[in-house]
Swiss-Prot record:
The keyword Chloroplast does not apply. The keyword Signal applies. This is U-actitoxin-Avt1. Residues 1-22 form the signal peptide.
């Protein structure tokens, strides 16, 4: 095999693996509310309610994490 064939096989495998992981992350969403990945991005460190990007989330204490 030449180097172009090796590189293209590697890239195809990379795309397949990343698509498979994305499918698994969205399929296990059986609880109501934001998806798990959205919850991770909503639960960020905060210094006040204005630091929480998701609607309805608040900052319980400065230096804490946003909560629903």
């Amino acid at each position: 095999m030449n180097s172009k064939a090796i590189i293209s096989v590697f890239l195809i495998m990379l795309v397949v693996v990343s698509c498979t992981q994305a499918t698994y992350e969205t399929e296990d969403d059986d609880e109501p509310g934001p998806r798990h990945s959205e919850k991770r991005s909503c639960a960020r460190g905060c210094g006040g309610d204005s630091d929480c990007p998701c609607p309805g989330w608040h900052c319980p204490s400065p230096g804490g994490r946003c909560e629903p």
